[in-house]
């Protein structure tokens, strides 16, 4: 019988549809079940800027989750995820919460949705993050948080691609 896992999705101000992320997860569900022996449920969490402190300090620590995916929109004025400003409190709370109940630490991914900064279709198909998005976030994260050793940062235009499914399987 497959182990049941819980994956929580987070987005501020409903700037990106979490259903798109759930589509990525659902497309990998048969492989996760067959190859890794686990199934999952998904819960959506939208929050406002004014709720970030409470979310980070009270809500997230109380959640029982195995994995978290934090989703931001590429066109947000500032993609400040892990540099001490912006979404830092939320992201770090997710990293802490997903590490407390597992042997592996910090099981939180970052998705940058609506990223139309790929050079061409070939680059988009072969990369799980655009060069533009990598430049934006690379100063905020060590390489192992970008390349799958500890986490992943994905970006895509309208929806995920096969490379994202493969990367997700690698990480799980």
For each feature predicted by the language model, list its residue ranges.
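Conserved GTPase G-domain substructure that encodes guanine base recognition and part of the catalytic core
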Residues: 1-172
